[in-house]
Amino acid sequence: MDINEKAPGPSGRRPARRRDGGGQVLVLYLAIAVVVAVLAWPWLAPRLGSFPGSLLSWIGDGGSVGAPRPATLDERMDMVEAALAPLAMRIAEADRRLAMLEANPRTAGEDPRKEAAGVSADPEQMSWMAAEIATLKGDLEIVRKLAADEGGATKLSGAVEKAEAAFRRIAERRDRAPLFLAALGQLREAVDRGSPYPAQMKAAMILAEKGTADKLAPLVMGSATGIVTRVGLAESFRVTAAAARKLDVPADSGWVPPNIRRWLGGAVLIRRTEGGEEGLDGILNSTSRLLAGGDLAGAAALLRRAEGPSLAAIQPWLEAAELRLSADAALSELSAMAMTVASSRDE
């Protein structure tokens, strides 16, 4: 036995042939080529106009990912023109047939032998022809009116754009309503606490609509310093009432101190037929009772009847009360409007 020959294995089988990695590399190249083709399809599609439409549509459907994009304005105009193509063909046919009908009488007049032969047209066919001509004339008149307007396509495009803008505004308004309602909630919390609210006010102004931003004007005045709460107004009214009574003391009141004079006046009970108290003391006492019951609007309305020197002490408190009432009314109205818009999102 030659020394170069290899001895067979103990089982008598040949050793297995070694496989190279050529097949795996080929599969990898094919996968990379497919991925590159899919990614480059948007760039290649306009440059492959000579390919058949079915092949391009099959490739486009296979390479597109996600939902189809909405048609643009140019595409919609192309669809409108395609829909008007049959009408244009009918108009051309109508013009041809009208020309033939106009030529027939002239031909008949030029050839009197046909009239002598007694050739007459079918009445049913003539009536059908007249109805068809009337229909075609109506269609032709409509198209001619549209064609006479040089800016018809521009007007149509502008109308479509206006409609799309209106739909976008409605959708944006519905989407911003919950955010505006949340901003109003934070603004109301700050106003109820009596603390400054510049950040909350800025957020509300950004999210508010054009017509709604004007309703936030009562809240702008107190954004830097805050608005006095209802409890604070009720507590500060005691000081205001005392200052108003001091200013209301007449010059010829004599030597009797004001507190003793008020005590003497309260010791005498006078039943009045109208059921109301008179003078500054009556107004201040009624205002105190209304504030104790939580009726700030009624207290402010009653206090506006005060006159005389005491008005200088009452006016600052009255302005603070009116600002509080205006702020509460504006927040309530804006919250109701925002909730109405937000509730219509699913309609």
Curated annotation (Swiss-Prot):
It is found in: Magnetosome membrane. The chain crosses the membrane at residues 25-45. Induction: Part of the probable mms6 operon. Keywords: Biomineralization, Magnetosome, Membrane, Transmembrane, Transmembrane helix. Disulfide bonds: none annotated. GO terms for cellular component: magnetosome membrane. Disruption phenotype: Normal magnetic response, fewer, larger magnetosomes; cells accumulate 20% more iron. Deletion of the 4 gene operon (mms6, mmsF, mms36 and mms48) gives an intermediate magnetic response with fewer, smaller magnetosomes in irregular pseudo-chains. Deletion of approximately 80 kb of DNA, including this gene, leads to cells that are non-magnetic, lack internal membrane systems, grow poorly, have reduced mobility and take-up and accumulate iron poorly. It is a single-pass membrane protein. This bacteria makes up to 60 cubo-octahedral magnetosomes of about 45 nm in diameter which contain membrane-bound crystals of magnetite (Fe(3)O(4)). The 4 genes of this operon collectively influence magnetosome size and number. This is Probable magnetosome protein Mms36. The lineage of its organism: Bacteria, Pseudomonadati, Pseudomonadota, Alphaproteobacteria, Rhodospirillales. The gene is mms36.
